[in-house]
Regions:
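Long compositionally biased, domain-poor regions of proteins
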Residues: 20-198
Length: 198
């Protein structure tokens, strides 16, 4: 291999390794703007089934654990319409990140478990308090502090689909998965097109 090709290849491999093994604790400023999210929502709404399948194929390649967390809901008794809502949420989140020009490090199962434990701990903490415990729990999440636009979209999508009643046992799973998607995205290490780490 020519020396001129070895250097870019090595740099690309090093960047991929750094992203794969990184976790984000950078600035808490939203990295996805309202404009990025609006463009993603519009794009997803105009897609047909085949186009959504192609996006899911890209998600499977780049973020297999996020996709599998949605698809695994069937084994927990979650209905196909609820899983469809979760898939649409994941597609919009993915497109919004893409619109922002960022590339996320692969979210591992350990990352997902860590964020899920944080969120469920916040839910347990607010259970005995007056008012809407779900809203109070959400305010404790990293996503609420870092990716407010994405989180607001997710909560609204769940609400519009009728999936925000935590007393309904099967509604709990979609709520947990959807909030966890945003929490994992909010904490994932990312790079911008210029290669700088965010």
């Amino acid at each position: 291999m020519p020396a001129t090709m070895a250097c870019p290849l090595r740099l690309e491999n090093e960047r991929a390794y750094e992203m794969k093994h990184a976790s984000a604790h950078a600035s808490l400023e939203p990295t996805v703007s309202a404009a990025h999210l609006a463009a993603a929502i519009t794009t997803a709404a105009s897609m047909g089934v085949r186009e959504k399948e192609h996006v899911c194929d890209r998600i499977y390649t780049e973020q297999p654990n996020l996709l599998s967390s949605v698809l695994a809901q069937r084994s927990l008794g979650v209905s196909m319409p609820a899983i469809d809502v979760l898939l649409n949420i994941l597609i919009v989140l993915y497109l919004a990140i893409e619109q922002s020009g960022q590339v996320l490090a692969i979210v591992s199962e350990a990352d997902q478990e860590r964020e899920l434990q944080r969120f469920t701990a916040a839910v347990r903490f607010t259970e005995g308090l007056a008012g809407d415990a779900l809203a109070q729990s959400i305010e404790q999440t990293t996503a609420y502090r870092r990716e407010k636009f994405l989180l607001a979209y997710v909560v609204d999508a769940l609400r519009r689909a009728g999936l925000t009643d935590p007393r309904n046992e099967t509604s709990k799973y979609p709520i947990l998965v959807a909030i966890n998607l945003v929490n994992c995205i909010a904490t994932a290490r990312r790079t911008t097109p210029l290669g700088s780490t965010v």
